[in-house]
A protein has these predicted regions:
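Protein-protein interaction/assembly regions in multi-subunit complexes
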Residues: 1-270
Length: 270
């Protein structure tokens, strides 16, 4: 039996939700739950900060005059930014703010190619009456990409490259409960709890994950079908070869047909 009902329930915020799939055949609740969870956490496309540059800073171990946080803390803050990038190429975002005060994602200058979903996220705290200037490079991707795998030749001198977590899903958990269908009590109900970073809704996240799985299974199904057709086909190389028709063969064939006709005519007269 295939599931006949999928229900999406809202959570405490628009980016926390629950998906309920029922009824599932015995054992398939865990199978579906674990598979969807892995895809949700690893394979959805998203965007993240890939590198940044602060005026007057040469590397991640430098001290920043007039800023409370060190570079390591700023890196951690940048990893928490939730954003959408609408182009394939990396986008450069800029910040220019005079202290004292708090620098947040809302201070990033507007860019038509980027949408900031976490405008209240803190980036740095300015403690002096100085101007803080920063460039943030954001890009699109899937899953997790460490800084070591990025080509540093693509960045200017003084740019600090960081690890990037592109997935828009922050957390996924699932549970399986028994449910009744008629007199049968061992069917299962799958409950998925999903939290995103604000750039995608839980419903869209589940739909994209299911589509990714369907695309992969379609390739497997297509490959299995092609193999089946190949087994049913007859190899032409195994067929007996036709002998070439020569003049002698054609003449013998005509004589045989003529003899048959004469014999039939004689029998008819009798």
């Amino acid at each position: 039996m295939l599931p006949s009902k999928v229900e999406f329930l809202p959570g405490e915020t628009p980016f926390i939700g629950r998906a309920v799939v029922t009824p599932c055949y015995f054992g398939y609740g865990t199978t579906l739950g674990n598979t969807l969870r892995r895809v949700l956490l690893s394979s959805l496309p998203g965007a993240a900060v890939e590198a940044f540059k602060i005026k007057g800073v040469q590397h991640e171990f430098s001290a920043i005059d007039g800023v409370k946080e060190d570079i390591v803390q700023i890196i951690l803050n940048l990893k928490q930014l939730a954003l959408k990038v609408f182009v394939d190429e990396p986008v450069v975002l800029t910040i220019s703010k005079k202290g004292p005060g708090v620098v947040t994602a809302a201070d990033i200058e507007k860019n038509a190619n980027v949408e900031i979903a976490s405008g209240d996220a803190v980036i740095a705290t300015l403690t002096a009456n100085k101007t803080f200037e920063m460039e943030i490079i954001a890009g699109r991707g899937r899953g997790y990409k460490p800084a070591e795998e990025k080509d540093r030749q693509n960045y200017d001198l003084g740019t600090i490259v960081i690890d990037s977590l592109y997935t828009p899903v922050r957390d996924v958990g699932y549970s399986v409960e028994y449910t009744r269908v008629g007199d049968i009590t061992n069917f299962e109900k799958l409950i998925l709890n999903i939290e995103t970073n604000g750039t995608i809704s839980p419903r869209d996240a589940v739909q994209q994950s299911a589509q990714i799985l369907m695309d992969h299974f379609a390739i497997v199904l297509q490959g299995a079908g092609e193999e089946k057709n190949e087994v049913g086909q007859i190899d032409e190389s195994e067929q007996p070869a036709e002998e070439p028709v020569t003049e002698e063969v054609e003449e013998a064939k005509v004589k045989k047909e003529t003899k048959v006709k004469k014999t039939a005519a004689v029998k008819k007269k009798k």
